[in-house]
Every structure is written in structure tokens, then in C-alpha cells.
Amino acid sequence: MSKAGGCRGCGCRVPQRASWSLVAATAALCLVLATSVCTAGAAPMSREEKQKLGNQVLEMFDHAYGNYMEHAYPADELMPLTCRGRVRGQEPSRGDVDDALGKFSLTLIDSLDTLVVLNKTKEFEDAVRKVLRDVNLDNDVVVSVFETNIRVLGGLLGGHSLAIMLKEKGEHMQWYNDELLHMAKQLGYKLLPAFNTTSGLPYPRINLKFGIRKPEARTGTETDTCTACAGTLILEFAALSRFTGATIFEEYARKALDFLWEKRQRSSNLVGVTINIHTGDWVRKDSGVGAGIDSYYEYLLKAYVLLGDDSFLERFNTHYDAIMRYISQPPLLLDVHIHKPMLNARTWMDALLAFFPGLQVLKGDIRPAIETHEMLYQVIKKHNFLPEAFTTDFRVHWAQHPLRPEFAESTYFLYKATGDPYYLEVGKTLIENLNKYARVPCGFAAMKDVRTGSHEDRMDSFFLAEMFKYLYLLFADKEDIIFDIEDYIFTTEAHLLPLWLSTTNRSISKKNTTSEYTELDDSNFDWTCPNTQILFPNDPLYAQSIREPLKNVVDKSCPRGIIRVEESFRSGAKPPLRARDFMATNPEHLEILKKMGVSLIHLKDGRVQLVQHAIQAASSIDAEDGLRFMQEMIELSSQQQKEQQLPPRAVQIISHPFFGRVVLTAGPAQFGLDLSKHKETRGFVASSKPYNGCSELTNPEAVMGKIALIQRGQCMFAEKARNIQNAGAIGGIVIDDNEGSSSDTAPLFQMAGDGKDTDDIKIPMLFLFSKEGSIILDAIREHEQVEVLLSDKARDRDPEMENEDQPSSENDSQNQSAEQMLSLSQTVDLADKESPEHPADSHSEASPSDSEEAAGFAPSEQISGSTENHETTSLDGECTDLDNQVQEQSETEEDSSPNVSWGTKAQPIDSILADWNEDIEAFEMMEKDEL
């Protein structure tokens, strides 16, 4: 997400009839007032060091952009591990995330205005020519309306804005004649059919060539869309209208915003995550500031800044008051139910909320922005990157990190608002982590698991559009930028739109369809910029004083948010039945459950599910007791499963030219050397003969002292391990024989033994899917000598590695101890469903609504539970691990089955919890919402 370029750090008004000079002056005044909050709290960074870091950002951008142009263009995105372009239809489907790809050179368009911000005007001119020459917007492909708007339409408009700026300066782009604007207008008209609904909310997808509903369009049957998807259009559509004079675009975007405002929950003033585009009914009724809603709030405030329409600010202020009243539990931002805003909807937060501190800076609410940003920074320091989702006690919930820019964005705006050099140090940490953990020979690779350091073959276009832009601006002085950044507003994709658009085409109707606005008693809602010298007099350490109590919040404390006694559980009250005491065969216990509104459902597989219907409880107090009982079930289940899991392992390629930059996610074995308890194993790789490793090796001299590569199939894993161990191998990597399999699209599992005593196997054994294994095989074909590191977690890359002329000795193995693996904490038995590549196509037997709570347990009375109304505090006052654990699958191989079926252990308790669907939908929403 992104913030406005002008008017930083305040909620200042852009006058509706202001001249452009007054608008610019207002923006400049806001910045002057906002930058005086503090100038201390960290050692000042010298201009030389800032320039050095700025130059480092430029080099990193060149590495990413250059590799895209060399290896991927004209494809939409670069696949940095395999050094090729991602072309839709030619790669395995990743689900909704692929809806951003339209065969229109997405990364190039998304990077246009970044080139100008980074003072690469020649490259910008070349890129514009390539877009005009090569890009086709009439492809027969179904794309996301939201992603196409913010990335492609926004990219074209941002490129046009800076092209006309450069042309006016008289040095570059003298040939330019609004060609990018013409393309933007063409694309705008292609998106308009999506708005053909009774509500005015757009369909989530559209076919660029055939539109909606036609048989050949393959879309138009959807009924739901996310709030952000429908509410993040006004900036681009209004800019298109004001650039071209065609008012229809702004009118359609305004109608969608008006409808969302009308459908807000009137008592809480919150909006849900997904809405029916035909009826306006809320489909998912949880509300937060992260995935699915985030940029809706952002665009209300920025639409006011860009367009000068008071109604947008009034709506934003109403929502912001509700956010701070219900969702903000400093330093946390926790989702709640729109109808029951005092009850938390979940106990985890997603990475997209990292944009919110930056939006609060634009609003002028600095203190909570500093608090939340510092909390997020502590999570990053623990995991190197911000996990896609993390729990309220800061454990990993979803381990992926697709190189999101939102935290860098908030860091930039907090620095501009406070002048505190602390935020320069934060930016420096981001640069170091990107180079240390994400940089690969062909660009920067997304992190598949922040705990192991494994990579995903993915570099999204927003990484170039946003990350480098914000990092460069963080360290740049005004003279380093060839234009005045304060004259522009940033879209959610960090594209630049000129503020002078507020004075053009003002004939567009601003009919107020809002009922009434809530009177809000808050000085932050003033229509002028706050004077920070008055707000924070003589306190240069203001920001530091706010951060200090949060320094150890991740490692040493368990923040519990605000305890809402008046709306939550009775303080000190105990439920009549504790989860640990419950017995399904006890009639008295069943009667107590009935009183609390909890019923038992016997499932076909012999398990029992607990479901709470609050309205069926004997009283509101009993309903609260039932809710607490369900929460205890979750905690009990989590604790029971903690010690039953084995975490994934890592295979790290450390020889030239990789130097540890490529990390592959590997499955462990239930036998052999345990890498979490022993030293890592380092060695060169060699293929075994026979390749399946099912008989005595015929090339023992080739694998002696090396890590043997073996193909899956034909015999047991343990038999393969014994054969390569007898040949002198120091470790083994089993590569899947199912072509195209990948840890991106299949659940990781443990290699099981053969039913015999496996204590004789002393070497470590790891499993790689076909896609990951092919990376090693390709490296062998190209470089012959390939050295890898087998460990429980990717080793920090030593700078000395890249200075070594020759690879280390082939016999140099098991040197340097690995760090202890962080506990695995993903959703139980859902490794194959959490990924966006796996849509939620199998659900638990019961699917209660948002007013229901559900839990399941096995007949053995290993009980667990789930509730949508999670609180952040444990009942006994201790920090409780609320992470859901991944159920690793064990698998043996049969002699005569080349296509081995994957058996799993009995379905664990939590896999039937009632909020399973919501959890999966939330992850998929993150992939839709500017992943």
C-alpha cells in the first residue's frame, strides 16, 4: 500500500477551488510542520553514508530490473531461480495470484515511474518505447480488475505523468505525444464492463478481449468481491477522467465507493472483507486493516487529497474512528466482527497491515503509527522478513514473504514525518536483509519460508514498482531527485499522480449519497495541518520514548491488547467446565455444554465436532462461558500437537556462482542424522548409479565423501539411504520422480523408515520435489562442481564465500553448527491448502457462520477447539502458543509403484475447525490484494 507524496504527516485539506500554486504551497507547508517532531533518538547518519545506501539501492534495482529485461521480457514477471519469464498458461497455475498476469509485460509497465524516481531517464525513455511497441492490451486472458487497475492502469498513468514532466523540462521525451495516456484510456474502457452489476460494484475478473459473461469470456459468474477490490479504483479512474476529459471512469469508481459506504455496518461503522456484488450482503463479516480491506481506507483519504471532495475525508474519519475504537489494540491491529466489534475475529495479523502506519502519518496520528511500526520491526528482526501472517505472540502463522514493500513504505513516511535517523537504520536493515537472504544470481527471490530461508521462484512486479522507490526516497536528499516529489500523490502501487489534477474537470457530480456523517470529537479530524511543534514541544526524543517500551515486545512479552471487560468475559470469572476436564461420555458435561450453546456433531469418520451457537445458550453469560470453553479447546489442541511435528529442512547451494543465495525447501526423514540436533552437512553432490539407489552402487568412487543424489521410487527410502551410505556418501538427497512436482504446489512430508530398525543409518537424508531438484541438476550440468549445505535452517551467507577462488574441499563436511530451527507454526494439516496454488476445495463437514464456533476432537479425547471470536489472552495469564502446527505427512514407497500415492496420518483435530474456510479465504485474499 502507499501514501500520498504531498501533505505528509497530517490530515490537511486541499481546498476545492484552490489554484495549483496554493495546493503545492499547502503540501509544502504540511511537510515543514511535520518534519520537526524529532531529530534525535538515534545517531545521525552522515550524508556520505546516506549516499552510499542510496547507491546501493540503485545497484539492487539494476540487478532486479536488468535480469527481468535480459531473462524474462516481454513476459509479465521474472522467475529468478530458473532465470526465465513467467508466462501465463506455460507454468503451473498458482490460483488467484496469476490473475495479475495478462501477457502485457506487467513488470515493465509497473516499473516505469520507478525509473524516473531513480533518475534513470534514458532507461525510462527506452522502456516507454518498448511498451508502445510491444505491449498488447487485447489478449484473450482473464485478469483481476483490481490488480490490472493498480498495476497496469496505474503504471501507464504514472508513466504518462512523469513523461509530460520530463517533456516540459525540455531534455527528454520530446517526441512523446500522450501515447501512454491513449493506452491507459484503451485499458480503462476494457475494464468498464466489469461494473455492469446492479450495485455498481465491479466483477472481480474480466477478459481483456471478450469482457464479461460472453461464453468465450470464461468469467462473469462470480458473486463476491473484496472491499479493497471494489474500493481501490478512484485514484486511477479519476486521474484517467481528468487527464482525458472522459468523466465516465470517475463516475463508475465513485458509484462503487458510494455503495460500499452505504453498506457499512451502521452501529460499528466498519466494513467486512468480502461483499456480494449483486445484493450488497456481506459475505465475510470480519473487519481489519489488512488483506481485503486495506487500500479501501487508503483511497478514501487520498481521494480527498487528490480530488478535494470533502465527503471522502468525512467517510475516512468515520471509519478511522471505528478502527481506533475497535481494531487498534496498541501495538496490535486485530480483526473483529463488524456486528460484534468488541470480539476479536482471529488471533493473527497479516503482513499487508504494515501499510497502516504510513496511512496514519498522512492522517497526522503519529503515536500509534510509531507503535505499530516498531512492533512490526521487532517481528522482522526476529524472522529477517515480515511473515505473511503472524500470531499475537509473534510466532509465524504463514511463513511466506513475497518481498512486500508495505513496511518500507511506512518506514519512509515515518522518517519524513519525524526526521528521526532511527528510521534510516531500519531502512539499512531492510537493504541488508534483501541482499543477504533474497538476492540470487538472476534477481531477488521471494521467501517460501522465513524460518528456513528457502526461496520461491517468484519476483512480483510490485517489488520493482514500490520497494526500490521507497528505499531510494528514504535515503535521497531533495537534490538527488530530478523533480519535486511533493507535487505528486502515491497510489497504492506507488505510482505517481500529479496533485494539479484536483483543479481539472470539476464538473463531475459529487452527489452526496451518504446518509449522515458521525460527529467525531477528535482534534485529529481538523481540516488543517497539525503543528507538531505545539503538539510535542521541546521533546526531540518523542518517537524514541514511544518505541522504547516496545523494544522487547517480541522476545520477552506477550502483548494481549485491550481487555474489554464491559463487553467481554467477566473479569476473574471461571467457566463451569474447563476444556482439559471435558469428557464426551460424561452426561453432566454434555448438559453443561448444551447450556453454553455448544452441541456435539458425530462425523462419519468417527470423530466428534463441537459447534457453538451463541443464540442457543441459556443466557448471554452462558454464551460467554461457551466462547471461553471453545478458546481453551484451541489452546489445548495447539499444546498437544507442538511436540509431534518435524520442521522442514533446507538445501543451500553454496558454490560459485550461487554463494548460498539459493535455498530450497526440503522434507526431513524419520531416520538418519537429525540436522536439528547435529552439525550441518556440507559437501559436493554426485548422482548415484543406479539413479534410484535401490541396489549396490556401481559408482562408489563418485559418491565417496559426497552428498548423493537419488531418484524416488522402486524401493524404500531407508534402503536407498543404506546403499549410498555403504558407498561412502556423507548424505543423501532424494529427488521426486513425479515430473513438475514442487513444494509450491504440494505438501511437504517426512520420509518414513521401512519398518525395520534404522539406527544403522547415520547420514542425513532430505527430500526435494522435482522442481527444486531440477535446480540442482541444472546447476550440475552448467557448472559440474556443485556444493550444497544440508541444514535445519539456511546458513547466513559469509562474505568470504564470494571471495573464494576455488570451492572448498570436497571432503569438508559437517562444519559449522546450524542454528536451532524455529518451531514450525503453520495451519494444521493445511500445507497443501494454505498456498494460493491450492484453492480451498475441500472443507470440514460443518461450516458454521460467523455467529457460530466449532471445534472437533477424536474419540480418544484428545480435544481441540476453534472459535472465530478469539481473545488474545490466555486464561491462566501465561503466554500461550496459538500457532497452528503443520502436520507433516509420512510416506513409504512400494516396490512396484512408480506413481506412489501419498498417504497421510489421521486428519488432525484442528483441520475440522469452523474457521478453516475463513483462514484459507484470508490467505487467498492476501494473494489477490496486491500480493
UniProtKB/Swiss-Prot annotation:
Q: Please verify whether the record's keywords include Glycoprotein.
A: yes
Per its UniProt record, what Pfam families does this chain match?
Glyco_hydro_47 (PF01532), PA (PF02225)
Effects seen without this gene: The knockout mice show largely skewed ratios of homozygous knockout pups versus heterozygous and wild-type pups. However knockout animals do not present with any obvious phenotype, only subtle changes, such as reduced weight of brains and body, as well as significantly increased abundance of circulating Man8GlcNAc2 and Man9GlcNAc2 in the plasma.
The UniProt annotation places Ca(2+) binding at T492
Q: Which InterPro entries would you find in this protein's record? A: 6hp_glycosidase-like_sf, EDEM1/2/3, EDEM3_PA, Glyco_hydro_47, PA_dom_sf, PA_domain, Seven-hairpin_glycosidases
Glycosylation sites recorded in the entry for this protein: N119, N196, N505, N512, N811, N815, N899
GO BP annotation list:
carbohydrate metabolic process; endoplasmic reticulum mannose trimming; ERAD pathway; glycoprotein catabolic process; mannoprotein catabolic process; proteasome-mediated ubiquitin-dependent protein catabolic process; protein glycosylation; response to unfolded protein
Cofactor annotation: Ca(2+)
Query: Signal peptide: which range, if any?
Result: 1-42
| Domain text | Contains a protease-associated domain of unknown function.
Protein name per Swiss-Prot or TrEMBL? ER degradation-enhancing alpha-mannosidase-like protein 3
Tell me the lineage of the source organism. Eukaryota, Metazoa, Chordata, Craniata, Vertebrata
